C-alpha cells in the first residue's frame, strides 16, 4: 500500500503548492487522476489475491499469478493484447482478469466486447493452452448488466477485497 501512496505523492503532491484551494476538486476529474486511480486499483487487487481467490471460490487451489502481454500485433482484428492479471490454477483452469476502476458500474459496450474477445483469443493462440479459460472482471462497483456483460464468467468488486 505504501507504493500506492508514493505514486499518489509523486503524481499530485510533490509539485503542488496548495495555494489553489480548488486544486483537489479540479484534479479529480482529469485524465491524470483516472490513470493514477486505474493503476492503484490494479495494485490493490493484486495485493489482495487471497481475497480474490476467496471470492472466486478457489482459495484452496494452487495458483500461479502473473500479467501477460502478447508478443506481436496483427491486423486490426488481431491487435496486440495485454491481460492485467492471469490466475493459472492447479485445476486446469485459467482466470484472465480484466481490472477496471470506475465511479459506478462498468458498462461493456460492443467495442469493448470486441477488445475482450481479442485478448482471450490472443492469449489462447500464443500460449497454446488447453486449459479452460474464464474471463474474470475485477472492478470498483461491478458490471452493468447488458447484452455484453455475459462475456465475464466471474466478477469481483472492491468490497470483496476487504
Predicted regions and their residues:
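Short mixed-charge
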Residues: 54, 58-59, 122-130
Amino acid at each position: 500500500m505504501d507504493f500506492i501512496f508514493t505514486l499518489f505523492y509523486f503524481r499530485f503532491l510533490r509539485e503542488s503548492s496548495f495555494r489553489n484551494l480548488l486544486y483537489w476538486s479540479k484534479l479529480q476529474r482529469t485524465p491524470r487522476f483516472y490513470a493514477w486511480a486505474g493503476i492503484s486499483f490494479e495494485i490493490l487487487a493484486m495485493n489482495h489475491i487471497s481475497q480474490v481467490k476467496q471470492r472466486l471460490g478457489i482459495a484452496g487451489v494452487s495458483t500461479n499469478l502473473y500479467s501477460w502481454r502478447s508478443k506481436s500485433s496483427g491486423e486490426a482484428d488481431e491487435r496486440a493484447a495485454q491481460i492485467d492479471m492471469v490466475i493459472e490454477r492447479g485445476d486446469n483452469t485459467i482466470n484472465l482478469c480484466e481490472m477496471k476502476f470506475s465511479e459506478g458500474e462498468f458498462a461493456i459496450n460492443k467495442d469493448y466486447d470486441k477488445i475482450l474477445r481479442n485478448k482471450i483469443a490472443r492469449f489462447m493462440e500464443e500460449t497454446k493452452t488447453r486449459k479452460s479459460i474464464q474471463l474474470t472482471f475485477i472492478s470498483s462497483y461491478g458490471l452493468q448488466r447488458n447484452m455484453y456483460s455475459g462475456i465475464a464468467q466471474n466478477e469481483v468488486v472492491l468490497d470483496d477485497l476487504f
